[in-house]
Regions:
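Short, compact, well-ordered microdomains
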Residues: 69-96
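The feature represents the first ordered module of a protein
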Residues: 1-62
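Short helix/strand-capping connector loops at secondary-structure junctions
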Residues: 59-72
Length: 96
């Protein structure tokens, strides 16, 4: 699998929250049918709460909200970012 880094951003917000977004363009395969591999992380360093979105094989697209794991239906990069921001606001009370 040839992966081309499409986007990477990591930041510390208010000396408390870590946000990291990594998106790779990959060949369309059975493992990555959308041609994208991603990892989105938002973590509260003070309380240990976290929101994670990724699509590693064999699980495919899914979301971690603290210790809970949920399936996720990937539609597009824009929708992925929109959903990530909504999850952060809903579960952490932080607007990016």
């Amino acid at each position: 699998m040839n992966a081309v880094l499409k986007y990477h951003h990591k930041a510390l917000i208010r000396d408390r929250y870590v946000v990291e977004v990594v998106i790779y363009e990959v060949s369309v395969t059975q493992k990555y049918p959308d041609g994208i591999k991603y990892r989105l992380i938002f973590m509260d360093q003070k309380e240990g709460k976290k929101i994670l979105m990724d699509n590693h094989h064999p699980k495919g697209p899914h979301v971690h909200i603290n210790e809970h794991e949920l399936e996720y239906s990937y539609v597009s990069e824009d929708k992925l970012m929109e959903d990530f921001n909504k999850l952060i606001l809903t579960h952490m009370g932080v607007r990016l």
